[in-house]
Amino acid sequence: MSWQAYVDDHLMCDIEGHEGHRLTAAAIVGQDGSVWAQSATFPQFKPEEMNGIMTDFNEPGHLAPTGLHLGGTKYMVIQGEAGAVIRGKKGSGGITIKKTGQALVFGIYEEPVTPGQCNMVVERLGDYLIEQGL
């Protein structure tokens, strides 16, 4: 399966039990900042934004004072899992980032998708990739 198929079929799919509800954007990005696959709607990010995200995984709490920035959008960092998941909120939407052995799985959502639904979609794929040694 190609990386693009993971994004299209496992991240940008309908939310289970909520036909027509799906993430706004999603991507799988290598920990070096190289894009493995992304939805057409995923924002163009700056290297320093990806560096900040990687620093927060290595030093949890790094982004809390300044917020998480991706594609010029600022998200308020909310409760995540230190070293494993970063979550951010902006208005009625937000972002979930799951770290795997080699990559970061991104999901961005807006209402009617809920934070919990985004977390479920992103973390399920992230956990699968971890199980596969990726």
Swiss-Prot record:
Kindly report the protein's main subcellular placement as a broad class: cytoplasm
Query: Which positions does the record annotate as the modified residue Phosphothreonine?
Result: T114
InterPro entries registered for this protein in UniProt: PFN, PFN_euk, PFN_sf, Profilin_CS
Q: Does the keyword Phosphoprotein apply?
A: yes
* Gene Ontology cellular component terms for the protein in this record: cell cortex; cytoskeleton
Which SMART domains does the entry link to? PROF
Query: This chain belongs to which protein, by name?
Result: Profilin-2
- Which superkingdom? Eukaryota
- Return the Gene3D superfamilies for the record: Dynein light chain 2a, cytoplasmic (3.30.450.30)
Q: Which Pfam families match?
A: Profilin
Q: Which family does it belong to?
A: Belongs to the profilin family.
Q: What does this protein do?
A: Binds to actin and affects the structure of the cytoskeleton. At high concentrations, profilin prevents the polymerization of actin, whereas it enhances it at low concentrations.
Where does this polypeptide localize?
A: Cytoplasm, Cytoskeleton
Oligomer and partners: Occurs in many kinds of cells as a complex with monomeric actin in a 1:1 ratio.
Q: What else is known?
A: The variability of the residues taking part of IgE-binding epitopes might be responsible of the difference in cross-reactivity among olive pollen cultivars, and between distantly related pollen species, leading to a variable range of allergy reactions among atopic patients.
Please report the PTM annotation for this entry: Phosphorylated by MAP kinases.
Q: Give an example GO molecular function.
A: actin monomer binding
- SUPFAM superfamilies in alphabetical order: Profilin (actin-binding protein) (SSF55770)
Q: Which UniProt keywords apply?
A: Actin-binding, Allergen, Cytoplasm, Cytoskeleton, Disulfide bond, Phosphoprotein
Task: Tell me where the sequence motif Involved in PIP2 interaction sits in this chain.
Answer: 84-100
Disulfide bonds, paired cysteine numbers = C13-C118
Taxonomic classification:
Eukaryota, Viridiplantae, Streptophyta, Embryophyta, Tracheophyta
- The protein's organism comes out as Olea europaea
